[in-house]
Amino acid sequence: MDEHNLDRHLKAYCDMHEEYQNLYATWSLNRKSCSEILKNVLLRYPHYSLHDASHAEAILSKIEMLLGDRIEQLSPTATWLVLHAAYAHDLGMVVQWRELQEAWSTPKFKEYLDLLTESEDKDLREAVLWLRQMEKNGDKSVLWPLRAVRSVQLIDAAYFRSQHASMSKNYIER
C-alpha cells in the first residue's frame, strides 16, 4: 500500500474535521460518476490509450510520487481539487451523438475536413479523402461499412480531442 495517498489524506482530514466531511462525500460520489462516464471514451477513441478511471488513477499515482510526504501539507480543498482534476480532465472526450450530429452539420466542421485533406497524419488524411470519394461515387466493397466507421472515428477523435479541455470545463460547469 502506498505510504502517501491523496484519497486517504482527504478522508483522514475530513474524519478529523467534521466541517470538511462534505468534501470527502462529494469526492466519493464524483469519482464514481466520473468513472462511469469515462468508460464511454473508448467508444469514440478506440485507437487511443485508455482514458478511463485507470488513467485517472495512474495520474494520481504519479502526483503522489512527486509530492511524497508533502501531501500531508495539502489543505482538504487542495487535495479535493487535485483528485477531481485527475478524474475530470478527460470528461470532454465523452461526445454525445447529438454533439456529433451538430458538429458534422456546421460550416466550421466542413472547413476542418478541408484542412484534414492536407494533414500530416496519413490515416486521418486518407479517412477524409475516402469519405469524400464515397460521397461522390459510392463504394461497392463488402467492407465499406467498416471503413466508413473507422474513417469517421479517426475524424471525430481528431476534432473532439482538440477541444476536450474546453468540453471538460463545460461538462463540469453544467
PLM regions with names:
Residues 72, 76-174:
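Divalent metal-dependent catalytic cores for phosphoryl transfer on phosphate-bearing substrates
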Residues 31, 56-60, 165-169:
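Hydrophobic faces of stable alpha-helices that mediate helix-helix packing
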Residues 33-58, 150-155:
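Active-site flanking loop/helix segments enriched in acidic
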Residues 45-81, 94:
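Alpha-helical phosphate/pyrophosphate-handling elements in metalloenzyme active cores
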Residues 1-33, 37, 41-43, 60, ...:
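Boundary/activation segment at the start of structured domains
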